[in-house]
Amino acid sequence: MEALRQRIEAAFEARTDITPSTVDERVRSDVQHVINMLDKGELRVAEKIDGLWHVHQWLKKAVLLSFRIFDNAVIDGAETKYFDKVPLKFAEYDEARFKAEAIRVVPSATVRKGSFIGKNTVLMPSYVNLGAYVDEGTMVDTWATVGSCAQIGKNVHLSGGVGIGGVLEPLQAGPTIIEDNCFIGARSEIVEGVVVEEGSVISMGVYIGQSTRIYDRETGEVHYGRVPAGSVVVSGNLPSACGKYSLYAAIIVKKVDAKTRSKVGINELLRIVD
């Protein structure tokens, strides 16, 4: 694996000289191998090790190289044809394979090859970009999008119209991460490498990027780029120092543990008690 990483790194440094017609066959093979392993979930752009998320930048480089290496090609779809460099993940699936992997894909859902979809997932008409990792038992609801290299945990619910930001460039940027057992409410956007930690509930219409203030009303703490585990978050505002205006913020209204979540429905958790 180290040799593969080094070859990808070297090819990326020389990427300006690479085209579909000039690429070395070893480089083409290496990049395709990485895409295939991402597709199977054998590799992932980010993984949690000893409680901390680690980003494998060389895998992002392989994904970027794929755009320089592969030509556009006609892709058959249910209602139309497409013309793109990246094939569709399920193009060669048959009934037996769908059943074996326990994946339900509703018509017009689009998943690009190089993204991993875990068992017992449901994909409503939605979009999953390459490099993404969607773990077991997750629901990606209608018009939700999972961006490039985003990491979605087990038993997550991405509600209708949710946007999970992608990241390929700049290379140093970490992917957006939604940890296990989270609920992301309709039309919310989580972007720019924000991490939503395990068991959190994000209400409808909440927008969180790296510069968004995430205010804990119980403690007065302000977080950036991270929603602490077990948070229930709604959209709100915080006053300016001068008191003349207010600016948008995400507000942590309460914390819940797994035991509470198992007994109380999502709608109950989102009811604010003043």
Swiss-Prot record:
This is 2,3,4,5-tetrahydropyridine-2,6-dicarboxylate N-succinyltransferase. Its EC number is 2.3.1.117. It comes from Shewanella oneidensis (strain ATCC 700550 / JCM 31522 / CIP 106686 / LMG 19005 / NCIMB 14063 / MR-1). HAMAP family: DapD. Substrate binds at residues 104, 141. The lineage of its organism: Bacteria, Pseudomonadati, Pseudomonadota, Gammaproteobacteria, Alteromonadales. It catalyses: (S)-2,3,4,5-tetrahydrodipicolinate + succinyl-CoA + H2O = (S)-2-succinylamino-6-oxoheptanedioate + CoA. Keywords: Acyltransferase, Amino-acid biosynthesis, Cytoplasm, Diaminopimelate biosynthesis, Lysine biosynthesis, Repeat, Transferase. One of its GO terms (cellular component) is cytoplasm. The gene is dapD. PROSITE patterns: HEXAPEP_TRANSFERASES (PS00101). Pathway: Amino-acid biosynthesis; L-lysine biosynthesis via DAP pathway; LL-2,6-diaminopimelate from (S)-tetrahydrodipicolinate (succinylase route): step 1/3.
